[in-house]
Design a protein with these regions (language model features):
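Fold-independent oxyanion-binding glycine-rich loops
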Residues: 1, 24-25, 59-60, 99-102, ...
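Structural motif
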Residues: 19-21, 54-55, 94-96, 113-114, ...
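Active-site loop/helix belt of alpha/beta enzymes
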Residues: 3-19, 26-142, 149-150
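C-terminal accessory subdomain/extension
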Residues: 148-230
Length: 230
């Protein structure tokens, strides 16, 4: 239905050869065309020139766990069969890709024309193997203000951040509206200031959170790493 709606709208606007990426459901059972859909999909792609498949892809359900290797190989075989149907219905070459982060590591012979590195971009190995992955992204901010507070004073909403000693508390301009998970507040999470961990104190606010820099040599304007190499 979605493909039909896309073709209809593209035809209505006079669009030709609009590039699309065809998702195959090879066993994840989330989204995509099934093997049973291939005859109808093939005919639909051949019957028009409004959209053109640029790639065909699928997604593993358990490539990070060796106990699912037989199922993962079934997914690969089914995907390849479906990919042939899509390729035969399209006049130009169609890229194939099924490998996610753990698939890249564990099924190296199935790289085809492209791979999709997901959680690996953050330096995390989904399959637990020592792959020497390194993060390629860093999020930094700066210290807005530092306050000297006394023992038993509180920081933030609901007075959740109760200080157990005289402390230096820094405010940094990032909060849950920026995607910083509120569950990381109340010392459950930390950031890095000048190479040292600074716990998040109290509840994380919408645009600001507070960190404990009592034992860190820092000043207002210093860089704070939210995530990255450190």
């Amino acid at each position: 239905k979605l493909l039909d709606a896309l073709i209809y709208e593209a035809e209505r606007q006079g669009i030709m050869r609009y590039p699309i990426h065809v998702k195959i459901d090879s066993g994840m059972h989330r989204l995509g065309f099934t093997l049973e859909d291939m005859p109808r999909l093939s005919e639909r792609l051949k019957s028009q020139t409004t959209v053109m498949a640029r790639s065909v892809f699928s997604h593993f359900a358990g490539s990070d766990e060796p106990r699912f290797d037989a199922f993962s190989r079934q997914q690969i075989a089914l995907f390849k069969e479906c990919a042939v149907a899509v390729q035969s219905a399209t006049p130009q070459p169609v890229m194939r890709h099924i490998l996610n982060t753990s698939g890249i590591t564990r099924f190296t012979e199935e790289q085809m024309e492209a791979v999709r590195l997901g959680i690996g971009l953050y330096g995390i190995s989904a399959c637990g193997m020592d792959t020497d992955l390194r993060t390629v992204s860093t999020l930094k901010t700066t210290i807005l203000q530092i306050k000297e507070l006394e023992e038993d004073q509180t920081v933030g909403y609901s007075r959740r951040g109760v200080l157990t000693r005289r402390s230096r508390i820094a405010a940094i301009p990032i909060g849950y509206a920026d995607g910083l998970n509120r569950h990381l507040g109340n010392r459950k999470g930390a950031v890095v200031v000048n190479g040292k961990r600074a716990p998040i104190v109290g509840n994380i606010c919408m645009d600001v959170c507070m960190i404990d820099v009592t034992d860190i040599d820092c000043k207002e304007g210093d860089r704070v790493e939210i995530f990255g190499e450190q």
